[in-house]
């Protein structure tokens, strides 16, 4: 079935971006694919200005000319266009400055709470995932070796597991 395509989105890395577009053009392109007007996209994307911190919108720059961190910010927000039920993010905290990492954690929590979005996050950053995830699945050589519900003790348990 092709039904999963309408409820799923992903941002894996900058290769998911269309480098010869500006951020606004990229968002309009995704919006068009999802049946959302330019006006709706323009209004919606303004809600992410605190996350963008003045570095993304209105820059008149091509996506390929942004830093890796700013490309990541643009791509993550692009993956949220149309309020998908499931969003896959690969190493979303990499290449982001500490302030943006904190903002991203808040953004993920807010989207999950407000829209019921499920985030599947692939990450090597134990601290961030224990702060934003309800469940953590450990994979080794493609096999699930642990499925953990996140508690206040999860970070310590993971640190102990990986130090052995």
Features from the language model and the residues they span:
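Conserved ABC ATPase signature
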Residues: 62-66
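Helical segment within the ABC ATPase nucleotide-binding domain
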Residues: 102-114
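Conserved signature/switch motifs of ABC ATPase nucleotide-binding domains
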Residues: 78, 82
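Helix N-cap at the start of a conserved alpha-helix in ABC-type nucleotide-binding domains
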Residues: 98-100
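H-loop/switch region of ABC-family ATPase nucleotide-binding domains
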Residues: 122-124
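Catalytic Walker B motif of ABC-type/P-loop ATPase nucleotide-binding domains
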Residues: 87-91
